[in-house]
Amino acid sequence: MKRGGYRQINKALNISAFENYLDIQHDHLPKLNDVEQLSPRVLRVLGQNAGKFTLQGTNTYIVGTGRERLIIDTGQGIPEWTDLISSTLRDSAITLSHVLLTHWHGDHTGGVPDLIRLYPHLSNSIFKHSSSNGQQPIIDGQVFHVEGATVRAMHSPGHSHDHMCFILEEENAMFTGDNVLGHGTSAVELLGIWMASLRLMQSSGCRVGYPAHGAVIADLLAKIAGELDQKARREARVVRTLARNKREEQSKGRSKGSMTVQELVTAMHGKGLDDQVRTMALEPFINEVLGKLAGDGCVAFEVRRGEKRWFIVNDVTSSP
């Protein structure tokens, strides 16, 4: 199992994306065509793996304007995608020169064996950061050229340790992978690193986002700003809750005012929570926030009677 394996990812999907996915039920997502020319240089082919966390399915992108083009991501290995990509390439007289993978998760890499089976010349042209199994490495800043398209790689960990975005220079656009989705928010392995990657993506100035899931992002900079603001507000709420508890406990002669994650969730969201919402979504998400805040030096924990209890290091807020 690779670092941040599927157990963690599936758990994380329930964590940081949970509130957003409740608001964006799958049935209410806009319909995307199986194959759609999004711009003169970008052709999207849906992965045929629609689901709660894959949205309309994994977007695979054929990039370029000439006969020879590259593809970004390969879907989940669904036979219907294999048939669709094969017929699309055949009908458009397109051949593939490179396969670029945004990261290692199976809904992005699962189609690689089928591509190699159909097009054996690609066996030495599969590119991924932290490469394995005969793949070629991608270096931060590496540039891939095909007719009509210059694609520059940007290492952007957070959703996964090996996550890459790709900038399409001719369009001032970015293939955002799973760091930024077309709908809702992404699951992350390390919240602080993901937020730093979003700031890096923001600094590129790319206006349009081609996400790995969901519709085209017309204003990528605004979407990223909204993601960062949302996470900052959630962090601030955790800090306020810990600070308030510390003041209340200090008034009773208890110095740290530490709380378990369960107590923190109850203080923030009340006692009437559904058990599954609490254990599968809110508690793991708050754990991720606390981990980031600990890395920032804002909070720490103590272990009492076998329980990890969190407390604020400095009461930085006087909010009630």
UniProtKB/Swiss-Prot annotation:
Pathway: Secondary metabolite biosynthesis. The active site is at D107 (proton donor/acceptor). InterPro entries: LACTB2-like_MBL-fold, Metallo-B-lactamas, RibonucZ/Hydroxyglut_hydro, Sec-metab_biosynth-thioest, WH-like_DNA-bd_sf. Its cofactor is Zn(2+). The gene is gedB. SUPFAM superfamilies: Metallo-hydrolase/oxidoreductase (SSF56281). It comes from the Eukaryota. It is an enzyme of class 3 (hydrolase). Atrochrysone carboxyl ACP thioesterase; part of the gene cluster that mediates the biosynthesis of geodin, an intermediate in the biosynthesis of other natural products. The pathway begins with the synthesis of atrochrysone thioester by the polyketide synthase (PKS) gedC. The atrochrysone carboxyl ACP thioesterase gedB then breaks the thioester bond and releases the atrochrysone carboxylic acid from gedC. The atrochrysone carboxylic acid is then converted to atrochrysone which is further transformed into emodinanthrone. The lineage of its organism: Eukaryota, Fungi, Dikarya, Ascomycota, Pezizomycotina. One of its GO terms (molecular function) is hydrolase activity. It comes from Aspergillus terreus (strain NIH 2624 / FGSC A1156). It holds the Pfam family Lactamase_B. Zn(2+) 1 binds at H103, H105. One of its GO terms (biological process) is secondary metabolite biosynthetic process. CDD domains: LACTB2-like_MBL-fold. This is Atrochrysone carboxyl ACP thioesterase. Keywords: Hydrolase, Metal-binding, Zinc. Binds 2 Zn(2+) ions per subunit.
